[in-house]
Design a protein with these regions (language model features):
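Serine-esterase "nucleophile elbow" of acetyl-processing enzymes
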Residues: 1-50, 56-59, 73-76, 84
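Solvent-exposed loop/turn segments at secondary-structure junctions
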Residues: 12-14, 50-55, 90-94, 137-139
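Alpha-helical cap/lid subdomain in secreted, periplasmic
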Residues: 33, 40-41, 65-151
Length: 151
């Protein structure tokens, strides 16, 4: 049986192109590149990214971006899951997210990962592995994307 890897994240997973606000072709996005590297015989990589997705915080302009509200359903549709690749948190620091700060985002990520475990979506007899990819460090010189800046 194929191993299933679910990539749950934000614009980096979705394939957002910062300069043009368009989307990379699916063959260029990193989940597809991971699938190519692993091959198609033994692995299935599920791409579940959304531009602007937050951890547990509501965006007042688009409440559908709250990752916690959709994560359980998304993960259930992909079960069983061997590896969850999780990358959220960067969008928690947008100016329209009042609760966004490092401590609250870290707690939100912890809560989401604990919730993912409690859903019981592991393959029988195996425990789902979780790969946490942390958000980039946001400093004054990183507030805007530069040419060839890949994050």
């Amino acid at each position: 049986m194929k191993k299933r890897i679910v990539c749950f994240g934000d614009s980096n997973t979705w394939g957002y192109i910062p300069v043009t606000s368009e989307r990379y072709d699916e063959t260029i996005r990193w989940p597809a590149r991971l699938q190519d590297k692993l091959g198609y015989t033994d692995y299935t990589v599920v791409e579940e990214g959304l531009t602007g997705r937050t951890t547990v915080f509501d965006d007042p302009f688009d409440p559908d971006l709250n990752g916690m509200k959709v994560m359980p359903a998304v993960l259930r549709t992909a079960a069983p899951i061997d590896v969850l690749v999780f990358m959220l948190g960067t969008n928690d620091f947008q100016s329209n997210i009042p609760a966004g700060n490092p401590i609250s985002t870290a707690r939100a990520v912890q809560y989401m990962l604990e919730t993912a475990r409690k859903l019981g979506l592991d393959r029988p007899g195996e425990r789902m592995k979780i790969l946490l990819i942390s958000p980039i460090e946001i400093t004054e010189d990183r507030l805007t994307f530069k040419e060839n800046d890949v994050t």
